[in-house]
């Protein structure tokens, strides 16, 4: 376990913004960071699967599920896919499922809540678009730093050492 965001705030206060969303921790990895990749979708996780199928080394996926906790946008199978493809973590403004299994996986996972319902698979959604969640903007290509203290974003990569 490692606290990174307090030190980053102390060192880079003028360069970071807080992604202030009421998210819970679901993955085993307590701290994670990387370049932001975005997906916007609603009750359809097809694009989430497409993105997590790609190499995620040094990247964090941020998913805008419109804040809906009716259907889970990620479960254990997508978490396994993310780990296989070296993703650092996933932030979901929506729901996840299979939370006991994911709690034992070495992946950073934060989400609004849980739902046992799966999503539809219609191929709907957008990839690498600017997201606005609770009046907060998330840009693909920026950098995200997360731990149990919070989530920070920066336009440039920061030294986490």
UniProtKB/Swiss-Prot annotation:
Record-stated family: Belongs to the class II aldolase/RraA-like family.
Keywords assigned by UniProt, alphabetized: Lyase, Metal-binding
Binding site for substrate: 75-78, 97
EC code(s) of this entry: 4.1.3.17, 4.1.1.112
Pfam families, per database record: RraA-like
Catalytically driven reaction(s): 4-hydroxy-4-methyl-2-oxoglutarate = 2 pyruvate; oxaloacetate + H(+) = pyruvate + CO2
Amino-acid positions noted as binding a divalent metal cation in the UniProt annotation, renumbered to this chain: 98
Protein name: Putative 4-hydroxy-4-methyl-2-oxoglutarate aldolase
Gene Ontology MF term list: 4-hydroxy-4-methyl-2-oxoglutarate aldolase activity; metal ion binding; oxaloacetate decarboxylase activity; ribonuclease inhibitor activity
Keyword tRNA-binding among record annotations: no
Assembly and interaction partners: Homotrimer.
Domain of life (superkingdom): Bacteria
Cofactor: a divalent metal cation
Classification via SUPFAM superfamilies: RraA-like (SSF89562)
Role according to the record: Catalyzes the aldol cleavage of 4-hydroxy-4-methyl-2-oxoglutarate (HMG) into 2 molecules of pyruvate. Also contains a secondary oxaloacetate (OAA) decarboxylase activity due to the common pyruvate enolate transition state formed following C-C bond cleavage in the retro-aldol and decarboxylation reactions.
Listed InterPro entries: RraA, RraA/RraA-like, RraA/RraA-like_sf
GO biological process: regulation of RNA metabolic process
Co-factor binding comment: Divalent metal cation.
Species of the source: Vibrio cholerae serotype O1 (strain ATCC 39315 / El Tor Inaba N16961)
């Amino acid at each position: 376990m490692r606290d990174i965001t307090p030190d980053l705030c102390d060192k880079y206060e003028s360069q970071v913004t807080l992604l202030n969303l009421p998210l819970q921790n679901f993955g085993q990895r307590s701290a994670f960071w990387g370049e932001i990749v975005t997906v916007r979708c609603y009750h359809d996780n097809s694009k989430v699967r497409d993105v997590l199928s790609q190499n995620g080394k040094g990247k964090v996926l941020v998913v805008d599920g419109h804040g809906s906790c009716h259907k889970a946008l990620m479960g254990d199978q997508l978490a396994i896919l993310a780990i296989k493809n070296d993703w650092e973590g996933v932030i979901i403004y929506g729901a996840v499922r299979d939370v006991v299994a994911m709690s034992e996986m070495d992946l950073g996972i934060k989400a609004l809540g849980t739902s046992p319902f799966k999503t539809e698979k219609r191929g709907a959604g957008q990839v690498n678009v600017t997201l606005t969640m609770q009046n907060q903007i998330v840009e693909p290509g920026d950098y995200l730093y997360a731990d149990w203290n919070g989530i920070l974003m920066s336009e440039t990569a920061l030294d986490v050492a």
